[in-house]
Structure formats: C-alpha cells, structure tokens
Amino acid sequence: MDEFVPRDFDVPRRLETPQFVLEPLDPEHNDQDYDAWTSSREHIHATPGWEDSSWPREMTPEENRADLQRHADDFRNRTGFTYTVLEPASRDVIGCVYIYPLPDSDYDARALSWVRASHAQLDTPLWRVVSEWLASDWPFGSVEYAPRT
C-alpha cells in the first residue's frame, strides 16, 4: 500500500483556535468521548458526511475504548489521523475530526467531523478551520469533506 502521508511529513499534533483545540484522540479520552457521541447520535447522523454512516451505533464504553485505541494506532502508524475536539477552557470533549485515505477515489484523503449536539453552533466553524488547515498544513492535493451551508 502507498503511504498515506510522506515519511518526511511532520504530522500536526495540535490545532488551537479560540473556539476549540484539536489533539490526537487516544484512550485517555474514552469517558468524555463516549459521553459526547452517545448524547448526540441523532445530531451526528444529521451532520454532513454522516447521513449514511453506520456509526455511531450502540457500543459499550469498553468497545469505545478499543475503537479509540485503533484510532491511536492508526495515528502512530500514519495510516489515518483522528483528533479529539476539546473546549479550550474546560478541556471537555466536544467532537472529533477524522482524516483517512479514500481508496479508489480521485481524492487524496477524506475528512469527517462532528460536534456534540450541545455545541452544534461550532460545526460550521470547525469545518471551515479544518478545511483551511488541510489545505495549508497537510500534503494533500484534494480532500473530500462534506461542505456546510
């Protein structure tokens, strides 16, 4: 398999704005991540890019922890990059951003993001900032990322 990102690419570890902070997702975020998405399943399914997704689905906290470990392993192996979205002051988990290959596509990568229902007003600002970040700081020529209106 071709590399998702070049070996010499320094993968960003953080993106900080006044509204949110992105950091690599890992199992330490399990409790807050689980609370964020389980409280927002309908909202996530209504978010652009998630309408036809099988996730989120029923999952135990232990299954969620294993999923977070898989995302952390992907990040370490440079095969995909998942970031938790944190509220800057409280450090509460308020969403996630996923950057993964999109095989058999004209796109170099696919990005998806969601925010918890209680922070729905941040969906478009998150999409805008991540879109700009992908264009300026990542080695992709084109990224599929469902637009917001």
Identify the function of each model-found stretch.
Residues 1-119, 129, 133-149:
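GNAT-family acyltransferases
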